[in-house]
Amino acid sequence: MDIFDPASFTSIFEKISKKLDKFSEIKHYELYASSIKETTITYEEGFIKKAFNKKSSGLGLRVIGQNGKEGMTFTSDYSDSAINRIVRDGRIMMRVSTENSEFKNLAVPSVKYNNVEDIYDPEIDNLSLDNIKEIINPIFDLKKRKIPPNSLSGNFSSIVHGVYIFNSNGIRKNYKKSYVNVNSELSLIDYNGFPSSGFSWQSESHLKDLNVEKVAEKSYAMAHRGLNKISVETGKYPILLSPLAVAFFIVDPISKAVNSEAIQNRMSFLADYLSKEIGDSSFTLKDDPHIPGKLNTTSFDCEGSATKPITIIDKGVLNEFYYNSFTAGKEGIETNGHASRSHYTSNVGISNHNLIMNEGRESWKDILAGIKKGIYFDYTGDSPNYVSGDFSGLILTGYLIEDGEITKSLSEALIGINLLDAFKKIETISKERKWIDEAYVPWVKLSEATISGRK
């Protein structure tokens, strides 16, 4: 069987559907199949440690009976005996499951589906291990630097992903998409024997858009710039967020907080803020699933509902939440196409598509030049408390700003602020933007935030 052939899955789905239709206790059913072709090279200490090609495929079945009782089962075997087993097991699990009066319906076919472009690249599909070894040479070349890395690791992956959806309401959707990812992690040792780490990565839907030389250079530059770190005095400083920091400190927390499941369960700091001002009027954030060639571009979500562009934050006002069919049904509204599944064995969740933050009018370098003393915040590995919005974390990569210039790297500096306060303290947004994975984001200046140092 060709695991990327829609006709093969249509045949399997129709076979299962005929079996399910015989059982009157089954009111709804959904079949979700996923196929993956992956080619990966992992390297450590500058040498290839592991390399593999693999293909995998599987199918998940959800059956829902009276009063929302649901059974879920799955298989990676498409034989007749395996199909009979998942139908049998799904019915058994449905019978013994808890009633769910909040379930209203599975997704229904949308009136219109937008065609999307450039989500599949045959160059990625045809990559071999030898091709990849050549592509990642710029990372290995870092060992030739005057100050060579003390350690060097990372990986390169190419993925082709097929999804096939079929349900009892008439949903019949499929797609095939591709992406590549490369990352580089290294450390350098300063003259006092203290390490400084650097990292960079890039993920793209098309091989031609991948710039491994830039990834290698950025990881080395970060580590080199971090040598001979300094401590800063505790206090309030103006903060200039890099696009990387904006993506992970501002945009990503919002995308998680507008998940309607979290909202309905009172597990989001934005639960009470719909149609209310949550940030500066200069701040707008959109979700656009139809941008050609981007990582999260898709015509439909993982339930088969049509996707559409939405404005999450409009001039500082919280405008919309993300919904799947279940959470939308609880509120008596239509889903806006944000159902997600990480795997054919996983439950239906909610996630974002492509996130677009608005641009400003000033160059980021002009914004920097206007800061007498402040902090350039590039990256933290910490996450906020999504219930309260409080954030207190280590600035893993950050620098002191002095007289409008980025100078020394920071050591053991912590940033503390509530995210709602951070949104309201947005003072300036740059006119330049960069893609960080699926987010298109600018530089952002916050008027102030508390920085805790060791001095």
Feature map (PLM): residue ranges:
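Active-site bordering "gate/hinge" segments
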Residues: 1-298, 302-305, 314-317, 405, ...
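Dual-mode signal for accessory low-complexity, basic/Gly-rich regions
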Residues: 273-455
